[in-house]
């Protein structure tokens, strides 16, 4: 891999037309490679209402702070951008899951910030539900059990099993994040990327992308090395893009597991320069995804093509959602200058 320069002279903080970026969002828009055009599911508004009802049913928005977070995060909008072709039922499951993961992630961050061990009851309950079908003991666990039920009713047994496996990996990743946050020494960029991959929470949605197809993928297609590589590339790109837009918020909160902030620590540069370096890394990832997909597409089944298009949808959707979601509004207040 070519060495990335971090000198002020070699990092251009302007768009291709040479017009200087005003704020970080301008900078990201100007430099990020996004080959996938904007799309939106027509059932977005119904999904948003469904999310509100589902969260209320399980008592997750009884806390005003959680209700405010959901309002600023717009989980149904993210689902609609990621899955523009999903039917209304599958879109609702995806939207519920996104909302759940935001609640779960924020709760885990609050609990484990200073003492990772305090996360163990919460994470153990989730693993017991996902792995063993154990009954929940908390409102958050009850919501997860219901989400698991929704997936089992809509997906094939194999798809539901993959969903549960990927979801357990996400749960385990949150403990890694808590340990990294509590560690006195900064996390180096390679380890940061590894932890970020674990807590991305994107791959649990890929079985839903498969469920949106006319039939299951054959095992040899689903587990082909190229398909596994496409899954990794798309999940990483999809979660790193929001890292660009959340960098200001995470920096103020003392966050460690963020791609842009990892570059800033490693290269001791300004946040705009770090964002530019992170964009370069993301661009190379998206291009590798695009090139590999182009190579294998002629060999894929129609369901395989739809499955990979679902992965691409996460790259596209996370970008267009991150640009305007109130959760990352700080991006508009941060100057793009070095």
UniProtKB/Swiss-Prot annotation:
The keyword Metal-binding applies. Mg(2+) 3 binds at residues 246, 250. Gene3D superfamilies: Farnesyl Diphosphate Synthase. Mg(2+) 1 binds at residues 105, 109. Substrate binds at residues 196, 249, 327-328. Its EC number is 4.2.3.162. One of its GO terms (biological process) is terpenoid biosynthetic process. It comes from Streptomyces viridochromogenes (strain DSM 40736 / JCM 4977 / BCRC 1201 / Tue 494). The lineage of its organism: Bacteria, Bacillati, Actinomycetota, Actinomycetes, Kitasatosporales. Mg(2+) 2 binds at residue 109. The Asp-Asp-Xaa-Xaa-Glu (DDXXE) motif is important for the catalytic activity, presumably through binding to Mg(2+). It comes from the Bacteria. It is an enzyme of class 4 (lyase). Pathway: Secondary metabolite biosynthesis; terpenoid biosynthesis. Disulfide bonds: none annotated. Binds 3 Mg(2+) ions per subunit. The record marks 106, 177 as: Plays a critical role for substrate recognition. Catalyzes the conversion of (2E,6E)-farnesyl diphosphate (FPP) to yield the bicyclic sesquiterpene (1R,6S,7S)-(-)-alpha-amorphene via a probable 1,6-cyclization, which could involve the abstraction of the pyrophosphate from FPP to yield a (R)-bisabolyl cation. The only accepted substrate is (2E,6E)-farnesyl diphosphate (FPP). Keywords: Lyase, Magnesium, Metal-binding. It catalyses: (2E,6E)-farnesyl diphosphate = (-)-alpha-amorphene + diphosphate. Belongs to the terpene synthase family. GO terms for molecular function: lyase activity; metal ion binding. This is (-)-alpha-amorphene synthase ((2E,6E)-farnesyl diphosphate cyclizing). A motif (DDXXE motif) lies at residues 105-109. InterPro entries: Amorph_synthase (IPR048138), Isoprenoid_synthase_dom_sf (IPR008949).
